[in-house]
From Swiss-Prot:
Source organism of the structure: Heliocidaris crassispina
PANTHER family: MANNOSE, PHOSPHOLIPASE, LECTIN RECEPTOR RELATED
Superkingdom per UniProt: Eukaryota
Entry-linked CDD domains: CLECT_CEL-1_like (cd03589)
Statement: the UniProt record of this protein carries the keyword Disulfide bond: yes
Protein name: Echinoidin
Tissue: Coelemic fluid.
Keyword annotations: Disulfide bond, Glycoprotein, Lectin, Secreted
Spans traversing the lipid bilayer: none
Lineage per the UniProt record: Eukaryota, Metazoa, Echinodermata, Eleutherozoa, Echinozoa
KW Lipoprotein (keyword) present: no
InterPro entries xref list: C-type_lectin-like (IPR001304), C-type_lectin-like/link_sf (IPR016186), C-type_lectin/snaclec_domain (IPR050111), C-type_lectin_CS (IPR018378), CEL1-like_CTLD (IPR033988), CTDL_fold (IPR016187)
GO CC terms: extracellular region
Domain C-type lectin: start-end pairs: 1-143
């Protein structure tokens, strides 16, 4: 398989970094504007990035870090959220909840209104929950590889 122009492949998926200031829902909608030719049972639409292993986490973090090197405190949306059921985090692409990299006491649902997830600068554990209505300046969209 291959990735569309400007997208980067890793494993069986394609990733693209964008410097766009959007809320979480706007970011997910933005990612859904990208697609690859349908493969039937596999979702061919883009979503905010999901992460399923330490190697994928490291890849995404390195891509994020190298794309934002002029920014000292960059923050980037991930597709992980518990908007449907508090405490039950899910990925927007429907993939399994099988990996997390929360910082410290996160997710803490501070002020009972933090249902979305961002990645922050700092290798290793770097996910923090925050209000979905917040604006973040960066995101990575994820697509399946073209067959």
């Amino acid at each position: 398989g291959c990735c569309p122009t400007f997208w980067t492949s890793f494993g069986s998926n394609c990733y693209r970094f964008f410097a766009v200031s959007l809320t979480w829902a706007e970011g997910e909608q933005f990612c859904q504007s990208f697609s690859v030719p349908s493969r039937g049972d596999i979702d061919s639409i883009g979503h905010l990035v999901s992460i399923h292993s330490e190697t994928e986490q490291n890849f995404v973090y390195h891509y994020f870090e190298t794309s934002t090197k002029d920014d000292t405190t960059p923050e980037m949306w991930l597709g992980f959220n518990d908007r449907t059921t508090e405490g039950n985090f899910q990925w927007t692409d429907g993939s399994p909840n099988d990996f997390t990299a929360w910082v410290g006491s996160n997710p803490d649902n501070y002020g009972s209104g933090e249902d979305c997830t961002q990645m922050v600068m700092g290798a290793g554990l770097n996910w923090i929950d925050l209000p979905c209505s917040s604006t973040r300046h960066y995101l990575i969209c994820k697509l399946p590889l073209w067959e």
